């Protein structure tokens, strides 16, 4: 069984796999073996990052920069925003989103009839319902997604049909298949390729409409004369895909004809959109501190992480008692910190933009879609703020805008 399929099955309430997962996730495991393993990995991962920070700081000094953060902003070609804009984003998210998540957690706790909400309780369906099943098989998945996109605008359905007719996607999960999902532009044919691991879940719908947004972006910008114009920064590329996630949601009745299932799917999508914003802000704020203080110790690093996390999560209603040592190193699960430093906040900017696009679509659907196509046609021929302006939205990080 593939990991994607296992994850899908584990959301259910009456199957053997779920019982196995519960058995290996008991309190004794978490408080003894889990803590021991975490401690071993934690030291090794801390040592690795310490070495990376020292080398990266040396690279920055050799290049004439005060720290690696300033060097990296330059190398990432961040011409349209500064570190202060990032700080504004952190502050705006911290003041606006956690109170909403706190209210959602209160409802979750009540539905699950718990005396305290533990971290793992946030990953289960609060109504203890079986996982949603939006499609029967891959052919059904393809047909419904094309129908969904056609309802938004017929041209979008034609774009996906072009991929389907040419065999330009590999959607179904199978044993031995590489993990993940992506849209890969093919600049000669100008027909992109979509790869993912569908297992029959709501997450598969979210993934394909996301990658479908990228695919439409690739096709609409195909006539730009230079490949470099189509090489998009994430702030722009993800605006297309994340916007399509939310816009398409207005047509998810194709996948969920039952009204209760449809509401449940939309609620899940919106909760995930909101919950990712504080995490992005936490990770980015942490990285600024790491490279502004390159000689810090591992203990100082974990203390700082905990301080930042508590700024955003102190009142979210999740009980971490007995798990403090694990919480101090939860940053270690974010591979970006190791592999692609400072590459992450772009997704937060794009997510805010996508919410603005969805708001625009709810109010004036045709105007919003015209603006959607207008910004995609630009590729990367304009500065990011101008591209967002073409979309009819702002490239803003203020508390008021959020």
What role is predicted for each listed range?
Residues 208, 216, 246, 254, ...:
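C-terminal, non-catalytic "cap/extension" segments appended to globular domains
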Residues 18-26, 130, 134-209, 213-218, ...:
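Active-site-adjacent "gating/activation" loops or surface patches in catalytic cores
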Residues 62-71, 106-121, 158-164, 224-230, ...:
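Short, glycine/acidic-rich hinge or "gate" loops at secondary-structure transitions
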Residues 108-128, 162-172, 233-236, 265-270, ...:
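A glycine-rich phosphate-binding loop feature that marks nucleotide/adenosyl-phosphate handling sites
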Residues 95-96, 232-261, 269, 275, ...:
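Post-HExxH zinc-binding segment in Zn-dependent metallohydrolases
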Residues 213-227, 247:
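Catalytic Zn2+-binding segment of zinc metalloproteases
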Residues 1-132, 144:
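A well-structured
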């Amino acid at each position: 069984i593939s990991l994607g399929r296992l994850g899908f099955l584990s959301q259910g309430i009456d199957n053997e796999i779920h019982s196995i997962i519960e058995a290996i996730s008991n309190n004794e495991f978490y408080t003894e073996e889990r803590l021991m393993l975490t401690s071993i990995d934690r030291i090794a991962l801390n040592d690795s990052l310490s070495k990376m920070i020292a080398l990266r700081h040396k690279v920055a000094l050799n290049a004439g920069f005060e720290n690696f953060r300033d060097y990296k902003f330059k190398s990432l070609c961040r011409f349209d925003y500064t570190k202060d804009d990032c700080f504004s984003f952190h502050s705006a998210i911290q003041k606006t989103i956690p109170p909403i998540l706190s209210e959602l957690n209160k409802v979750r706790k009540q539905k699950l009839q718990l005396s305290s909400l533990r971290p793992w309780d946030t990953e289960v369906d609060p109504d203890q319902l079986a996982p949603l099943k939006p499609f029967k098989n891959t052919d059904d998945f393809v047909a419904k997604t094309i129908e969904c996109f056609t309802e938004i605008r017929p041209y979008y359905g034609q774009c996906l049909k072009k991929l389907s007719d040419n065999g330009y996607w590999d959607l179904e999960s199978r044993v031995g298949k590489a993990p993940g999902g992506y849209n890969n532009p093919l600049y000669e044919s100008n027909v992109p390729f979509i790869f993912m691991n569908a297992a029959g879940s709501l997450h598969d719908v979210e993934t394909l409409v996301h990658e479908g947004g990228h695919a439409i972006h690739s096709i609409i910008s195909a006539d730009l004369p230079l490949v470099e114009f189509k090489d998009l920064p994430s702030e722009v590329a993800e605006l297309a895909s994340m916007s399509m996630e939310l816009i398409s949601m207005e047509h998810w009745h194709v996948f969920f004809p039952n009204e209760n299932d449809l509401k449940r799917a939309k609620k899940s999508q919106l909760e995930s959109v909101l919950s990712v914003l504080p995490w992005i802000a936490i990770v980015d704020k942490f990285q600024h501190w790491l490279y502004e203080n390159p000689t810090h110790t591992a203990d100082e690093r974990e203390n700082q992480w905990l301080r930042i996390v508590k700024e955003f999560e102190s009142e979210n209603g999740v009980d971490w008692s007995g798990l403090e040592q694990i919480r101090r190193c939860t940053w270690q699960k974010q591979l970006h910190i190791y592999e692609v430093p400072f590459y992450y906040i772009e997704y937060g900017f794009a997510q805010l933009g996508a919410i603005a696009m969805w708001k625009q679509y709810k109010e004036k659907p045709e105007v919003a879609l015209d603006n959607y196509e207008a910004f995609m046609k630009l590729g990367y021929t304009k500065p990011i703020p101008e591209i967002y302006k073409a979309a009819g939205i702002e490239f803003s990080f203020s508390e008021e805008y959020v």
